[in-house]
């Protein structure tokens, strides 16, 4: 047995009973014990009173091993999956590790090359997945009867008894989400295929090409000549065109690393990867010989930490936090902010606040925008809408009234201020409108010709001078301003009636902005309606195409609301074609999941009135970290 093999086995034995973050790839180096200085500390109590010698087939005897740890001899297998959809393949991977459900694990994402971090995004883009693997399991280590395990007192005492995002995030970072109860050691040679929605290759052909490639890789046949023969056969027999992604032997097409290669062509991606053994081996048969000398952990089995916390105060809150973390996978450094924003959200005004009964005289109660000579007027609700002091996480236009001809602006916000950010939101509010911005008249754009009403498209953002006047000699990074209210106004500028936007800003102390992103709706292919709209577009917003809110019929919706895409609108309403009613919201599914609104602008896209919303991430200044 090589020294490397002995080290891996010793690490594998010590990993049993440790914590693990299921969002990570299944590697021994990612095991968690809660304390980096104590490398052999476990999260669960194992019987150490009757330690014994553990015989591992092919590797000899290991001393002083808990009697709760057993070892079984492994085997060499060839596994071929069917061509499955995203959720079924994810569920299969979870079953291999004794994990319930279909939420993708880090191992699943690493195997198929998913890097977006968004379950909904990946599932929406993928048509099908397949796998062909040659697996050499040298032995299996496992804890006897894992369902009777008990967490150590230090882990039980670390469970927060209340909803404290900082403490909950610290627990997950230190201990992970699951406890390792089994480790399989050996090597695996895997080829996987990922088919995107853009590919029209049917499942039977995809399966045929996958299995054919697996045979060539794992049987030791002459790979290059066989591949050329198959391509010639397809051409000569008028078969469907051979998918170039499966030509993994062409160095010009394939990107290769140590134990990993990837080839992506025409919506099909083929990934070949080895774990364990010598990655420099030229063939599969040569690689097999090296597995006993260089083994690695190829699969883990787990039990959820929360299943061992049934009698611990706060276990339900921790379970909820872990469920959110596994579902949306925010970065660990943002986890406490993500949990801070994970509470319920509401719209202002709520539907109960909208007027019912006999409507007032529109002409006298509300100003109107004239769109054309013969068409209907678009009345404007100029009542200010506020979220009190709750951070705003989204906006939309809404058509009120019996005839749906009264334009209003609605705000989505967190439903309470009992958050880390909420504790620092002050009572200092400042209103700022597009009419207050210098040279705002340069951004007047007509709704439907110069003779009709106009829209002021200048972006409304906080004034940097506010920080200088309110910081009280502190660092300017100690103060941020967020949107907590909005109002539409119609003002006369000479003979023009112009629609303006006002925003209410609220001061947040001890916080600073770390990232900004402008988001707009899916109207058209261009968001610029004129030269002034182009001039007012933020240069720091990045690629506008990537920040569009897409309405894809294949999108995986994780929102359980009755109308997650917004309330229904009468299909035949004549006003709808002039107003974009998209909901511009960012929630937990938009990594890292704690966006809030800091700016808005009105703009026109092909004659349609739209919103363009600036979202930002806030971090707390001088965040205290307890020991």
From Swiss-Prot:
Matching InterPro entries: CAD1/NSL1-like (IPR044663), MACPF (IPR020864)
Key word Protease present: no
Bilayer-crossing regions: none
UniProt keyword annotation of Ribosomal protein present: no
Pfam families, A to Z: MACPF (PF01823)
Gene Ontology biological-process entries: plant-type hypersensitive response; regulation of salicylic acid mediated signaling pathway
Keywords in alphabetical order: Hypersensitive response, Immunity, Innate immunity, Plant defense
Location of the MACPF domain: 1-339
Function: Negatively controls the salicylic acid (SA)-mediated pathway of programmed cell death in plant immunity.
Family: Belongs to the complement C6/C7/C8/C9 (TC 1.C.39) family.
Protein's name in the database: MACPF domain-containing protein At1g14780
UniProt organism field: Arabidopsis thaliana (Mouse-ear cress)
Source taxonomy: Eukaryota, Viridiplantae, Streptophyta, Embryophyta, Tracheophyta
């Amino acid at each position: 047995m090589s020294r490397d093999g002995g080290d891996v086995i010793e690490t594998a034995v010590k990993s049993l009973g440790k914590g693990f973050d299921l969002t990570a790839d299944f590697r021994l180096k990612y095991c968690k014990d809660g304390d980096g200085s104590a490398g052999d500390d476990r999260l669960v109590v194992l019987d150490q009173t009757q330690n014994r010698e553990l015989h591992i087939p092919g590797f000899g005897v290991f001393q002083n091993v808990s009697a709760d740890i057993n070892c079984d001899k492994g085997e060499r297998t060839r596994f071929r999956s069917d061509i499955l959809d995203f959720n079924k393949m994810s569920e299969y991977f979870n079953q291999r590790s004794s994990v319930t459900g279909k939420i993708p694990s880090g191992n699943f994402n690493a195997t198929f090359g998913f890097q977006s971090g968004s379950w909904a995004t990946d599932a929406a883009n993928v048509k099908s997945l397949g796998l062909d693997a040659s697996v050499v399991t040298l032995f299996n280590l496992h804890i006897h009867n894992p369902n009777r395990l008990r967490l150590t007192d230090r882990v039980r005492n670390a469970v927060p008894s209340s909803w404290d995002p900082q403490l909950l995030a610290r627990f997950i970072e230190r201990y992970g989400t699951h406890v390792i109860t089994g480790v399989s050691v050996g090597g695996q040679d895997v080829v996987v295929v990922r088919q995107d929605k853009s590919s029209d290759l049917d499942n039977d052909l995809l399966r045929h090409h996958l299995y054919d490639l697996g045979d060539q890789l794992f049987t030791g046949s002459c790979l290059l000549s066989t591949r050329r023969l198959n391509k010639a056969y397809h051409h000569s027999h008028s078969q469907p065109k051979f998918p170039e992604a499966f030509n993994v032997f062409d160095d010009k097409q394939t990107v290769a690393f140590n134990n990993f290669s990837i080839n992506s062509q025409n919506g099909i991606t083929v990934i070949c990867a080895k774990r364990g053994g010598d990655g420099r081996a030229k063939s599969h048969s040569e690689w097999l010989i090296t597995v006993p000398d260089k083994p690695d952990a190829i699969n883990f089995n787990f039990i959820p930490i929360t299943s061992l916390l049934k009698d611990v105060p706060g276990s339900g809150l921790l379970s909820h936090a872990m469920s959110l973390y596994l579902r949306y996978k925010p970065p660990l450094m943002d986890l406490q902010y993500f949990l801070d924003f994970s509470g319920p959200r509401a719209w202002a005004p709520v539907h109960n606040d909208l007027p019912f009964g006999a409507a007032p005289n529109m002409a006298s109660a509300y100003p109107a925008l004239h769109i054309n000579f013969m068409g209907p007027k678009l009345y404007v609700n100029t009542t200010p809408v506020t979220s009190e002091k709750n951070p705003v996480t989204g906006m939309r236009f809404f058509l009120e009234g019996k005839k749906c001809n009264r334009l209003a602006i609605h705000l989505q916000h967190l439903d309470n201020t009992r958050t880390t950010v909420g504790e620092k939101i002050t009572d200092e509010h400042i209103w700022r409108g597009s009419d207050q911005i210098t040279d705002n008249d340069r951004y007047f754009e007509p709704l439907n010709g110069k003779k009709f009403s106009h829209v002021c498209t200048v972006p409304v953002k906080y004034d940097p001078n506010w920080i200088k006047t309110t910081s009280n000699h502190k660092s300017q990074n100690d103060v941020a301003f967020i949107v907590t209210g909005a109002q539409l106004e119609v003002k006369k500028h000479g003979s023009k009636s112009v629609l303006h936007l006002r925003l209410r800003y609220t001061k947040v102390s001890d916080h600073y902005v770390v990232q900004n992103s402008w988001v707009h709706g899916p109207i058209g292919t261009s968001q610029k309606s004129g030269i002034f709209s182009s001039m007012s577009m933020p240069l720091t917003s990045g690629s506008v195409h990537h920040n569009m809110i897409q309405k894809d019929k294949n999108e995986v919706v994780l929102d359980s609301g009755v109308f997650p895409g917004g309330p229904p609108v009468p299909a035949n309403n004549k006003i709808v074609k002039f107003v974009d009613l998209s909901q511009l919201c960012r929630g937990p599914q938009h990594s890292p999941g704690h966006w809030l609104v800091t700016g808005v602008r009105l703009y026109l896209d092909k004659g349609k009135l739209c919103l363009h919303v600036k979202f930002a991430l806030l971090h707390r200044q001088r965040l205290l970290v307890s020991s």
